[in-house]
Regions:
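Conserved G/P- and acidic residue-centered "switch" motifs that form tight phosphate/ATP-binding loops
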Residues: 183
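RNA-binding accessory domains that recognize and position tRNA/RNA substrates
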Residues: 1-177, 187-214
């Protein structure tokens, strides 16, 4: 896979200031992935595409993106054409020797003006894959889900989703101070505020030896 498709949920509810929130999320992603040979970051119709370099290690990328607030889910992905034959061929090539007892194709259209519906894409691409692999179609509990996202200039396809941290991008809701005590409540409160977009400044009073180590 050459790209990463990053989806956000809460940001999509924003109004005219939505581009600023997306810009902050892209900034945070760039900071989190610094040094991993990423080649490009693009906002593409309700999602963010990150282009990976040839030296990029996916497992390290996965670990870092999972910690970035503002993301609903993300996936390693490739681009394909609108043509159903060529798209199915590209998917089959990337599937390689993978085996699955059952599968389904789940398609969405980023642009509703495209001259085909999502069910048509699922039926046409899924039929071609079934013809080659012989896999059983299961729309309820498939062993493998092939996700398609149809864009005006092509399509993304990917085979799974990693859960993101959710919330809002860090830096979109101002700064707060958090007094760290010896309990679990203060770090939990800090995490919840970070998830709402706050930049947290941590404060701790080291009072030993005036007070005992227990206090």
């Amino acid at each position: 896979m050459n790209s990463i498709v990053v989806h956000y949920k809460e940001l999509a509810l924003k109004g005219r200031n939505r581009p600023w929130f997306i810009q902050m999320l892209v900034r945070n992603l760039k900071a989190a992935l610094a040094g991993l040979h990423m080649q490009a970051f693009r906002s593409v119709m309700g999602r963010i595409e990150i282009e990976m370099g040839p030296e990029t290690e996916w497992e390290e990328v996965r670990t870092r993106i999972a910690r970035v607030f503002g993301i609903a889910n993300f996936s390693p992905a490739n681009r394909g054409p609108h043509d159903f034959d060529a798209l199915a061929a590209a998917i089959l090539k990337d599937l390689g020797d993978r085996e699955a007892a059952s599968f389904r194709v789940s398609a969405t259209r980023a642009d509703k003006r495209l001259p085909f519906t999502s069910p048509v894409v699922e039926r046409e691409v899924g039929g071609r894959i079934k013809e080659v692999t012989g896999w059983r179609v299961d729309l309820s509990r498939p062993a493998l889900t092939i996700h398609l996202e149809m864009l005006p200039d092509g399509a993304f396809y990917f085979f799974g989703k990693d859960q993101g941290a959710g919330g809002l991008p860090t830096g979109t809701s101002g700064r707060v101070a958090c007094l760290l005590s010896g309990g679990i409540d203060s770090p939990v409160a800090a995490y919840r505020m970070m998830r709402r977009g706050c930049t947290v400044l941590f404060i701790h009073f080291h009072s030993y030896p005036i007070l005992s180590r227990a206090s």
